[in-house]
Amino acid sequence: SIVPIRCRSNRDCRRFCGFRGGRCTYARQCLCGY
């Protein structure tokens, strides 16, 4: 799921998404549980 936060790196998303992890998209949004 998309999380509307401004990420700078995948690490930001992993912290925000929790154990399932996530990645930072080109639009600087986190995509969790991909």
From Swiss-Prot:
Keywords: Antibiotic, Antimicrobial, Disulfide bond, Secreted. It is found in: Secreted. Contains three disulfide bonds. The keyword Disulfide bond applies. GO terms for cellular component: extracellular region. The keyword Disulfide bond applies. One of its GO terms (biological process) is defense response to bacterium. Active against both Gram-positive and Gram-negative bacteria. This is Buthinin. It comes from Androctonus australis (Sahara scorpion).
